[in-house]
Regions:
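Catalytic helix-loop patch of NAD(P)-dependent Rossmann-fold dehydrogenases
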Residues: 8-51, 55-56
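NAD(P)-dependent short-chain dehydrogenase/reductase
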Residues: 40-86, 90
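NAD(P)-cofactor binding segment of oxidoreductase domains
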Residues: 1-2, 38
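Aromatic-residue hotspot detector
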Residues: 1, 10, 63-64
Length: 91
């Protein structure tokens, strides 16, 4: 069994990448439901796998990458957050 989850199971305060076994501390209802889903899957099948992903982009649907490319064409200067680190994931 594979559970698709998210980095929202963490509180976002880490200054280095989260390890797979880092203690969960969700700050939102969404994060809490994802954490509960992870727990339920592991309880149901100890051989299960949890895949946490974020910053998805691809050919279909909106994404940060597509938005930045569009804005770069439309504007001379664009502003983005500079206090986040992530790994864009092709989906």
């Amino acid at each position: 069994m594979v559970q698709i989850s998210t980095d929202y199971v963490f509180d976002g305060s880490a200054t280095t990448p989260y390890a797979a076994d880092h203690p969960q501390a969700p700050c939102s209802a969404y994060g809490r439901t994802k954490a509960a889903g992870e727990w339920a899957v592991r309880l149901a099948d100890p051989a299960s796998m949890v895949v946490r992903t974020a910053w998805l982009y691809g050919d279909h649907g909106p994404s940060f990458v597509k938005t930045m490319l569009r804005l770069a064409k439309e504007r001379e200067t664009i502003s983005v957050v500079d206090d986040q680190t992530g790994q864009p994931t092709w989906a």
